[in-house]
Amino acid sequence: MIISHKHKYVFVELPQTASSAIAKELKANYDGHEILFKHALYSTDFLKQAKPEEKAYKVISGMRNPMDICVSNYFKVKTDHENRYSNPRLMQHGFLRKYIMRWWNVRQYKSIVEKGETFEQFFTRAYSVPYASWSIIEHKRMDFIIRFENLNDDFAQALKVIGVDKVRDIPVANKTAEKTKTFWEYYETDTAKRRAKYIFGPYLKRWDYDFPESWNHIQVPWYSFFMYRMVNIARVIFWKFLR
């Protein structure tokens, strides 16, 4: 998490939304400095310790199409991004999350690298219930959301919201290797597309993302929305109190 007392803003780092690059840029050129820990939540981590005047600061964060995140996850494991998967280490923060993420990384490495899973095999195995991130907790109440798909234009708009002029575009950092196509092209078969509609449909609708028009022959099943609501009850409890 990044805070600037000079410009009165807080940047909440949602994972896999270019948050590292944005945070680095805010620290370099917009008087930001680190507070709490990287992926701290605004409502449960920041507000508990914030001073009254800090609670009035503008709040910005990021967002990214989860279909893109899924493809990126696959290639990060396949290329052993930053040796994160061949030599997994515990995260520094989180009550349960650090153990869950280490288990997840080990499992994906064995399946993708050692067993040679394709993207579709990985997607079918690893994604079984409708997707959500902890953006569902508080992003709707934030002052501006920077979309990964429109990164530099949205970053410029976010800076306007907090009242500062843009110095430059965000330098590319932490880029995933080996991706050679638009992310939705990796969902090649109708089987993968149906799975994607079930897994991502409710989240995409919530955040005004669209599936490709060429997928219109496949509908998001009604029970996906029911499962999304049910699973999110447990997710919110985990993210707020157990992670």
Predicted regions: what they are:
Residues M1-R243:
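Membrane-interface amphipathic segments in extracytoplasmic regions
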